[in-house]
Structures are given as C-alpha cells and as structure tokens.
Amino acid sequence: MIRGAHFSDIHYAGATLTEVDRCFTFAVNEAIDRGIDFAVISGDSTDHALDVHAPAVEALARNIRRLADYCPVLMLQGTFSHEPPGTLNVFRLLGGRYPVHVADRLEQVALLQGGTWQASASWRFDDAPQGMRALFSCVPTVNKATVAAAVGATEAAQAIGEQLSILLRGFASINETARKNGIATIGVSHGTVHGCMTEHGVPMAGFDHEFTTASLFSAGATAFMLGHIHKHQAWQQNGRLIAYAGSIGRLHYGEQGDKGFLLWEIGTDAARFDLVPTPAKRTIDIIFDGMPDLDDIRKCAQETGIDGAFVRVRWTMPEEDRHEVDRKEIERILNTAAEVKLEGRVIPVVRTRAAGISQEASIAAKVQAWAKATEAKGEPLLACLEALQQKTPEEIASDILTRPIVAQTAMHAVPDTECAAIAEEAKALEEPVELF
C-alpha cells in the first residue's frame, strides 16, 4: 500500500493568487501532516503564461519546493492555454530533497525505492524496472492541432479518442506485470471523460472528448488520477478507481461541491481515497426572474449568513424597467460580503414581424402577408407598389397632380334667431342642451 496526494487545476495567476495560494498552501500542509509517499499535480498548475518575476510564480514554486522537501513530486502538462509548453521546466530545477518530475510527453515513470524517478525511453517500459514502489502511466494534454493536421480537422476529435484508447490498452500488459510483483499501478492524465459533470452541473456528453471510463479502465491501472474538470467525481470498477480531484479553489460563481485534494491509498488490486476540503471561498447566488426584491435579499442575507462571502445577484427584466433597480440599496444590504456582483439581464423590446413574410418570394406577396397579419387593406398599397415598379417618378407625380379633387360641402351655420329660440325652449325644459 502506498499513500499519495493528488492535486489538480490549481490555476496560479495574478487574478487568482489570493484564492489558490491560500487553498494550495493549506492542502500542502495537510498532505504533509497526514503522511504521503508521493504527490501528483494532474495539470493546470498555472492559469496562463506567467513572467518568471510574477508573484504567482514565486508562490507556486514555494509550495512545490515544500512538497519536494517531503516527498517525490510528479507534475503533468495540462491544457496548453493554461500551461504553455515549457512552463513547468523550471520546477525540475528547484533542488528539493526529492526530485520533481515533469511529465510533458507520453511515458511511464517508475517511483523507485530511494524516492527517485525513472522515466521510460519511449511511451512505455518494455520491462518493469527493478526496485519500483509504484508505476505511473502518464498521458499529458494531447495537442489536437497536431492531430488535426495529420488526419483533418473534421476527423481530429474522433481520431484522438481512438488513438488514446489504443494507447491506454497498450499500458495494460506492463501494468499487469507490475501488479503481479506487488507494485501499485497509477495512471495520470488531463482531459475530459465522456459523461462527466462540470463544476456547474453540466454533463459533458459530446463526441469530441478524449476519454471514456472504459478506455481508462483498459489501461489496467489500479488508480487513475485525472485533471481538467473542476468538479470532484469518481468511477469504480472491481476495486479500481478513476477520479477527478477537482480544482483546489473556487474560481467562479456557481461552482458546485467542495473544493480540495484527494488523499489516495493504493494497493495492487484496489484503491481508495478521501477528499480533503480546502478553505475555498464561499459563493452565494441570489437569482430573480424579474425585478430584484429587496425584502427577499434581506431575508437571504440573514438566513445564509453573507459575512465574508462572495455574493452575486442576478435578475431578468424588461428594457423599460431597467432603471427601477436600486443597486445602491442592494449593495448596502449586502455590505458585509467580501464581494457583491450585480448582473442584470435586460430583455430588449422586440417588434414582431408579420408571420411568414420572410418566406414570400415577391414584394407584392410580402405586402399581402403583412396586410393580412395587421388586418389592413392591402389594395391601396399594392396599387402604389405597382406604380413604383412600372412608372417613372415623373409619371407618378403627374398622376397625383391630375387627380380630381373631391368637393366637400360645408355645413351651413345656424341663424342667430334659431339659436335664440332653441335657448328659450331649453330654459322651459330646465334641462341642459348642447348647442352647436
């Protein structure tokens, strides 16, 4: 039985430094206190390319060195946009008590009895090295652009999945030999498993993902440590386990579940792990379908306890009501939160077009469709349209000028004598009469 700590998706950067350094420092302390034989970081140690003088680089290096002073460390190449190729090379040079091995190619790595690493010359060992404590099969991020250039962009996703499945099956024989010799076998990779869940609860059910649980189990490793997906989740088969550690901290609003690292115990035929939570920041979402209700916000603030939390208020409302939201009052109610983020979604005013008008071929047919939808008379418009299509501007102007003017008869005024008579009759009736 061998014990190891599995960290993943740390994402050190300037913007994330406070959150991830607090969580990773805590995780390193916990791993050392609990006693581990090795540490694995399964990709995305950084969030993007970093300058060597950046505080995030110093903070990450400090914690990696602390780990290396306690046990051997394996760092896997993650997503290229987060860890550009070569980013991890500097960690090979930290010079701790134990070496840091950077797995940036397809390979197998043996953890020897003295706490050193021995990497295979090619993608796998032909014969298991002597004196192993554990055998790691490493599958770093695959460069999809290289695959697309070789097989075509439309076939790249399927080709990657097929080739990785063949590769993983290729590890099975050497892993079986190692298990028979009482050696723990461990897989480490960075990618997406078909059917896994994102940190926001969305299933990844597309056909362009690198792995399936079947292909990962086919490698014959007792434990398979994964990175890339920020939600902790696992699959089990006959005592063997596949698991995402999830991200070390909470980097976005709406992320579900605890954040932490996995503490593994791995034997030859079975494995187990515990999720050790880190002090990730607490996020709260307050969502309204319409106008934000200040009373509901106050109630939520009292019931959930917003002190020190990161609070996001979201609402959806018509465009004409957008100025009715009292943002300052919302911020005042939530003033004990560490951060308040207000996100209003405005529904724009939509003017409906006549149904089916875009499907008509001619302008005349479009006019008829519009007239039918609006219950208007279409004949005058069609007559004008015909004139525009068949006559010159001069002819149209001439027709307008020569049109006969319909004579209108003016209403004759009522003589003054008749008005006086009507007034006298009204007085006699003692009822008001409207004069015109």
Regions found by a protein language model. Name each.
Residues 90-209:
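Conserved catalytic scaffold of divalent metal-dependent phosphoesterases
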Residues 95-98, 193-267:
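Conserved beta-sheet core of the metallophosphoesterase superfamily
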Residues 1-5:
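Extreme N-terminal starter segment of soluble prokaryotic enzymes
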Residues 108-132, 240-314:
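Binuclear metal-dependent phosphoesterase catalytic core
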Residues 266-436:
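Accessory, non-catalytic peripheral segments of nucleic-acid enzymes
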Residues 16-116, 213, 217-221, 229:
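Core catalytic region of metal-dependent phosphoesterases/phosphodiesterases
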Residues 11-13, 45-46, 79-81, 107, ...:
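Catalytic metal-binding/acid-base residues of hydrolase active sites
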Residues 9, 24, 39, 44, ...:
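Divalent metal-coordination and catalytic microenvironments
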